[in-house]
Amino acid sequence: MTATLNTVQDLEASVLAGTAITRDEALSLIDAPLDELSAAADRIRAQMCGDGFDMCSIINAKSGRCPENCTFCAQSIRYPTISVDSYPLITADELVRQAQENKDKGVIRFSIVTSGRKLRRDEVRHICEGVRRIKQEVGIEVCISAGLLSAEDFQALHDAGISRVHCNLETSRAYFPSICISHTFDDKIATLQAARDEGMSLCSGGILGLGESMEDRIDMALSARELGVNSFPVNVLVAIEGTPLAGTEQLRPEEVQRCVAIFRFILPQAAIRLAGGRELLGDDGKACFQSGANSAISGDMLTTTGTTIASDMALVKDLGYTVTLDHSHS
């Protein structure tokens, strides 16, 4: 494909034919008519992924007192004016209880999220115990988001029954030092590669509204494509008082919708997953679910309130989706 094929229709046809969109081609979509762009992204989603909708929920299994300095996060100890619940790892019984509660509501993927740079080895063993019980007693897909874990950690977690690892890139490689300097973009990449090498599927996306450019957002998605991510979460910044990003101007819903549509061109087969901040869009993400997004994190987030699982189930059904695991869930 040549760079002259830069219309929405030409790029749609190229993506559907199996050609990977280039960076310049993705950049050309920034100024495309939104309605045309969204409709094309939805057609790509329908042809490449079908009408399945992957609904997951998360549990804040260890909260607060994180030593890292991510500028958007309320759980960092670097920002002492923020009041956030802090507690150690919850019990295996509580993990099982919450997994069952979410499964009963129709959720098909349950992610265990912990604060901190990474889990200690004894904490990994504790999580493994809970996961084995969840797989035996509940029967639900289990994911983990536990920081910069090692290959040895991933082997133990995979053996226990965890199928997917989440570790957000957050933004582009170029912009990453603007939001965090206590760890690096390459630390993230190494973590995801270690999980992939262990045979686990990858969930990695980022946050819109950190002050990044559209080019940064596209570069983030291209990095995710290079990693072969199966799920690409799209968060919208909830600017929390007390963090360095407090007072940041909120993105317009149309800008988020445009980003989601462009992400679908870049990641035609991934589950593009609306995540934190969806309540800021005004329609709980409906326009984005018609612009290439085909999955969501439902319920409350880590330190912010989300949409209800029941309302999400009704919304995606009305849009013609069927709740099911994304096609690349292994």
UniProtKB/Swiss-Prot annotation:
Its cofactor is [4Fe-4S] cluster; [2Fe-2S] cluster. Its EC number is 2.8.1.6. Pathway: Cofactor biosynthesis; biotin biosynthesis; biotin from 7,8-diaminononanoate: step 2/2. SMART domains: BATS, Elp3. Residues 48-278 form the Radical SAM core domain. It catalyses: (4R,5S)-dethiobiotin + (sulfur carrier)-SH + 2 reduced [2Fe-2S]-[ferredoxin] + 2 S-adenosyl-L-methionine = (sulfur carrier)-H + biotin + 2 5'-deoxyadenosine + 2 L-methionine + 2 oxidized [2Fe-2S]-[ferredoxin]. GO terms for molecular function: 2 iron, 2 sulfur cluster binding; 4 iron, 4 sulfur cluster binding; biotin synthase activity; iron ion binding. InterPro entries: Aldolase_TIM (IPR013785), BATS_dom (IPR010722), Biotin_synth/BioAB (IPR002684), Biotin_synthase (IPR024177), Elp3/MiaA/NifB-like_rSAM (IPR006638), rSAM (IPR007197). GO terms for biological process: biotin biosynthetic process. SUPFAM superfamilies: Radical SAM enzymes. [4Fe-4S] cluster binds at residues 66, 70, 73. Keywords: 2Fe-2S, 4Fe-4S, Biotin biosynthesis, Iron, Iron-sulfur, Metal-binding, S-adenosyl-L-methionine, Transferase. The keyword S-adenosyl-L-methionine applies. It holds the Pfam family BATS. Binds 1 [4Fe-4S] cluster. The cluster is coordinated with 3 cysteines and an exchangeable S-adenosyl-L-methionine. Binds 1 [2Fe-2S] cluster. The cluster is coordinated with 3 cysteines and 1 arginine. [2Fe-2S] cluster binds at residues 111, 143, 203, 273. Belongs to the radical SAM superfamily. Biotin synthase family. PANTHER family: BIOTIN SYNTHASE, BIOTIN SYNTHASE, MITOCHONDRIAL. Homodimer. HAMAP family: BioB (MF_01694). Catalyzes the conversion of dethiobiotin (DTB) to biotin by the insertion of a sulfur atom into dethiobiotin via a radical-based mechanism. NCBIfam families: bioB. This is Biotin synthase 2. The gene is bioB2.
